[in-house]
Amino acid sequence: MSDKIIEFDHVVAGYSPSRTILNETTLDARKGEITLLIGPNGAGKSTVLKTLFGMLTPRSGEVRFEGKRINGKAPRELLADGIAFVPQGRNRFGPLSGRHNRELGGITLQRGELAGRIDEVLTQFPRIRERIDNQASTMSGGEQKQLEVGRALLL
């Protein structure tokens, strides 16, 4: 069995037919390793992530997660496959409580399973556990980012 968790196999992608950003891009990310995308502005780092997370469909080539082809899958379908994305910046629903923000991350889980997963994830974020019923917009920037990461971990 392969230890590759993410594979790009000769992927071609861009934002218009005349603007190719990824040209025959091949990369592997292996389980248990840390993989960094490093490069100057415009090198394609964000395009790789948008392609991986279903925000951009490759024109050719294959993107695989745990050996399964995921080209063209919508972000919601990728959630069901166990792929979550915590983008830079703040991505919480301010008027909702921390608890409701967390529940949104578990949208693919059954209600009973969701409660158990939320409790499990909250053990990793004790400060968020204390403030889980507060409105997310009243949390500090760091707490909001913890909330977002916790939401992604609910998968």
What are these regions (language model features)?
Residues 38-40:
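The feature captures the beta-strand-to-loop junction immediately N-terminal to the Walker
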Residues 15-17, 35, 73, 98-116, ...:
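ABC-type ATPase nucleotide-binding domains, specifically the catalytic core motifs of the NBD
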Residues 53:
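Helix-to-loop junction immediately C-terminal to a conserved catalytic motif
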Residues 152-153:
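ABC ATPase C-loop
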Residues 135-139, 143:
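Conserved ABC ATPase signature
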Residues 61-70, 81, 114-116, 120:
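Conserved ABC transporter NBD signature motif
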Residues 6, 21-22:
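Conserved structural motif at the start of ABC-family nucleotide-binding domains
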